[in-house]
Amino acid sequence: SKVVEIKDLTKVFDFINETALFKGQWQYKQGRKSKEEYQQIVEETVLPKYKEIKATAIREKLLEAKLVYGYFPCQSEGNDLIILEDDENTEKQRFTFPRQPLEQRGSKNLCLADFFASKESGKIDIVPFHLVTMGRRASEHSAKLFKNDDYTDYLLFHGLSVESAEALAEMWHKRIRTELGIDGND
């Protein structure tokens, strides 16, 4: 496993899903407004606030993008993904995953374990895992804003920190796919 710290937050911000941030986290929704009216709100209110809060987060070092990731030998058995010790013989951990319900439209009744080499095949596969964080300061700053009844800034900063964590996960998922040579059209 490796621990990584991303110093340049703009690289993480490039992966932010702005729709999820603006509409989901920040609640700037079109509602009954016309497309043009909504776009005007986004351009005049949302984007300047977004730019400002990102600059503040960088300047005050409120977000600390860190992650740990690694590649682990594995095999599958039914709905289980079996993580193996480095010796590739000893079971270290077993995860059981659900299968898509047959009655779900278009379902192929797949399970995550189906995408890994089976124990029965005798082949050893690799599974990557990664965990991300935007750091303790993000949580502390959010808590401080909330405690001080600064709900608007709390909502904006907390939303940015949540979506930044999602962006970091997406960014590193892309990196893992590249390292594994399965990035295709990423």
For every predicted segment, state its role.
Residues 1-155, 159, 180-182:
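Active-site loops and adjacent core secondary-structure elements that bind or stabilize anionic groups
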